[in-house]
Curated annotation (Swiss-Prot):
This is Acylamino-acid-releasing enzyme 1. The keyword Endoplasmic reticulum does not apply. One of its GO terms (cellular component) is cytoplasm. Its main location: cytoplasm.
Amino acid sequence: MATTQASEAATEKGLPLGMDVSMVDEYASQSKLLQEFVKIPTIGNAWIFNSKTENTSRAIVSVGQTDLLANKKRSFLLNSHISKNSSNSVDFQWSPFPIEMSGVSAVIPSPSGRKLLLIRNSEDDSPTKLEVWGPCQLENEIHIAQSVHGSLYVDEWFEGISWNQEETLVAYVAEEPPQPKPEFNDSGYKKAGSSEKDCKSWKGKGDWEETWGETYSKKRIPALFVVNISSGEVRAVKGIPRTLSVGQVIWAPSSSHSLVFVAWSSDNGYQKTPRKLGIKYCFNRPCALYAVPDPFMEEADKPSLNVSKGETAPTTKLTSELSSAFFPRFSPDGKYLVFISAKSAIDSGTHNATNSMHKIDWPADGKLEGLSVADVVPIVMCPQDGCFPGLYCSGILRNPWLTDGQTMILSSIWGSKEVILSVNVVSREVSRVSPQDSDYSWNVLALDKDNILAVSSSLITVPQIYYGSEVCQTGKPNQWEWQEIATPFPSPSDKISAILADHKFSILKIPISNSSNKLADGAKLPFEAIFVSWKDSATRPTIVVLHGGPHTVYPSSYSKSLAFLYSQGYNLLVVNYRGSLGFGEEALQSLPGNIGSQDVNDVLTALDFVIKKGLIDASKVAVVGGSHGGFLTTHLIGQAPGTFVAAAARNPVCNLSLMVGTTDIPEWCFVEIYGKEGKNCFSEYPSFDDLCQFHQKSPISHISKVSTPTLFLLGAQDLRVPVSNGLQYARTLKEMGVETKIIVFPEDMHGLDKPQSDFESFLNIGVWFKKHMSK
């Protein structure tokens, strides 16, 4: 009732719908401060190229900036000349101004750095444009009609734009051209092949085709193409079954005249399903590596990629013995094909899990019969204290190799931190390259021969670029030294800098509260929580922050949104409960079958931990989370009534029995409720007992106990947790008389990541918490 009365009062005063009259000034001041956070640029990709002089090189860094007025993210390229001297110090000489990439969907420098490919995808039926730039001019502009293919895939999953070594051809993944639709006119159905133009004819819809779900609702079939950058000729790669969706294409060594790519089956591989299941954030979709001939090679010159005689399709499956293979990379000498596998996620059904790394010895003659897969980095089940917890890899550089041709540099998760690792694919040695004693997160941006360009940040400390060099020590393991690089990026305003400077940052080890003999050893280990606090934290209000997934992690890297909430005077307790990435496979697999209980208990245990240590005021605690974090948020206000003064949920999972029939990942409901057995009992038609279990473990089963004022932020285009889930729960709270506020973003999907939506979301969270924490 309080929200309704406030809205009526606001309407009478001519204020926006839903505006609380008492919070108008707070709304204005917080929005002004949040805009200052939005102005801080983000660091994207980077590329480094060798120069003719031995101790110099060239760098390109992509920088992003939010344009709230246009509701989009703008991108820029910044160039730098790198000079190294004998004392291992390095100097970056940046260009005075960045170059804006307006209308550019992707930027792909050639391996030598002498050419630059710009992709301009069209938002309508106009041709896709590929621009090939040389040192001083536009060398070619290629227009590709929709009849050839649709937009190129530039996302982090299917994307695979790849130059060949000679820099004459580019392979890429694009939307398959649209299939013919039935056409009708005054005489009824218009038969195919008719060349008559009839202004009275119209096209029907034809058969419906499944998509890959969340964020891919307008995409159907990713297909493989190669373009000659000189002639502009585009050829589709033949021989790939239409049931395979392709991505992550790379060129094999030149002698092979072939391409290697990842493919996902539309029936979910060996886990046969009648549909495509959502693939965004889902590493548990079976996939494999394939090889196919370069379509520009003459038939007589093509090597035989067939596994056996009589096989007509040129596509060869390279990883038949594994259920998952992605992120393929060839070693510089072409001897090894190295890749990542999420076979643990496939086997268990969880949407993400501990990765493994493997390699294939690539045959010099290009004959691919009888290839075997060797392990490089195995799955870590239960890490020893302080030791490597396993590989958690969300991407790999296009060129991740040091000059020895055997060592890869990549980013991974280690507990609550992102770290940089070196992996020797021959010796199988894994080492941590980023500072051992740092709780900050580190990510690799690019390699400069045997040196590393990286970015480091903490939850509320803006990213800073570093340059790392390996230092040899006699009789001791080599160490990496890191030099902070001055950049022309604008610093946060004096006001923000002053606020953020006054903080404490730590990663807490939280002992579990309910250890039992049934738990695997890894599940008995402490989990972690990131605690960002003011010096007088015990008198300040605190926000508990919960990640989604549940098999993701909230790393210690910079978050604009959390830095903004901290600036409002809150401590932040970010809980990486058991089931999160970065703590070994046994801890992760302890959660499926126990959601709504184990994860809820871990959050309450972490909260109790900081309360008992006198770090926070127990009477001033709020909670916020999205997706599975929203599941936990709504569970907590029901299972622990009176604990939280206020709550905010972004696209929360509130009722699994409703979600299972509407989400793009219905099998998630079965796996997280039943554990590993859920993978086998998944059905598009849940039984009565299934629906009862789903309801029993859902937050809505505890809703009668809720009294916490709750804010809901929902995306109307969400296919992962459809808007009906949050609306049902929120409407029930309103029916019960609990103070509730709902904001629906009509054009947003699950991430609520359109700039204006993200801004309005966290502005309202800040104001909502201020209103209820100030009472």
